[in-house]
């Protein structure tokens, strides 16, 4: 296999998928729309129902593999469902980010991406989320990190902010 970095010479072909909740087939089929022209895959949260098993984490990689074959860059954004379950607190150990965080910046193909971790849509006291939840602290740390940022892709063709936003029903 061969990896091809994002190439913006003809614009960027980006596929952004969220909320497929462990249903890989439709998301993967849609993700192959660009074929070899795909530049960047964004997995924008809720790609699994929760993080109760390591097998579920593997589904995130399986989805990326079915779309990119390991040959294109993938950006991962945590969704609110990835805040629930036994392994939720360990998710940064298995997925890309920086410094053990799921909020980070990256530049690909002339595009600057800022990835925010909007974490959970429930309070830390809610029994449905992991007992190790401390999202108030995470939000404080992420706010400090955001306030310390000085580069926002000013020399890039595109500047893109990524976040998974849970909408209450």
Describe the role of every protein-language-model region:
Residues 1, 58-155:
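Extended active-site neighborhood of metal-dependent phosphoesterases/phosphodiesterases
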Residues 1-15, 21:
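Acidic, histidine-bearing metal-coordination/catalytic regions of metal-dependent phosphoesterases
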Residues 15-19, 41-46, 72-80, 160-164:
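Active-site neighborhood of phospho(di)ester-bond hydrolases with catalytic His/Asp-centered motifs
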Residues 22-26, 49-52, 78-87, 121-124, ...:
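Active-site environment of divalent metal-dependent phosphoester hydrolases
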Residues 26-32, 56-63:
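A short acidic, amphipathic alpha-helical/loop segment
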Residues 32-51:
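Active-site metal-binding motif and surrounding structural segment of the metallo-beta-lactamase
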Residues 40, 111-113, 158-160:
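Structural motif
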Residues 150-169:
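Short acidic, glycine-rich surface-loop motifs adjacent to enzyme active sites
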């Amino acid at each position: 296999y061969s990896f091809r970095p994002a190439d913006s010479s003809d614009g960027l072909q980006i596929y952004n998928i969220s909320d497929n909740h462990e249903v890989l087939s439709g998301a993967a089929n849609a993700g192959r729309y660009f074929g070899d022209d795909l530049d960047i895959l964004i997995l924008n949260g809720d790609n699994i129902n929760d993080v109760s098993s390591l097998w579920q984490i593997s589904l995130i990689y399986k989805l990326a593999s079915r779309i990119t074959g390991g040959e294109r860059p993938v950006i991962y954004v945590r969704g609110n469902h990835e805040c629930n379950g036994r392994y939720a607190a360990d998710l940064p150990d298995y997925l890309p980010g920086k410094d053990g965080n799921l909020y980070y910046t990256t530049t690909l193909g002339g595009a600057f991406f800022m990835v925010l971790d909007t974490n959970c849509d429930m309070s830390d006291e809610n029994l449905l989320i992991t007992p190790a939840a401390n999202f108030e602290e995470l939000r404080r740390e992420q706010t400090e990190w955001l306030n310390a940022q000085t580069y926002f892709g000013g020399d890039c063709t595109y500047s893109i902010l990524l976040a998974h936003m849970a909408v209450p029903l």
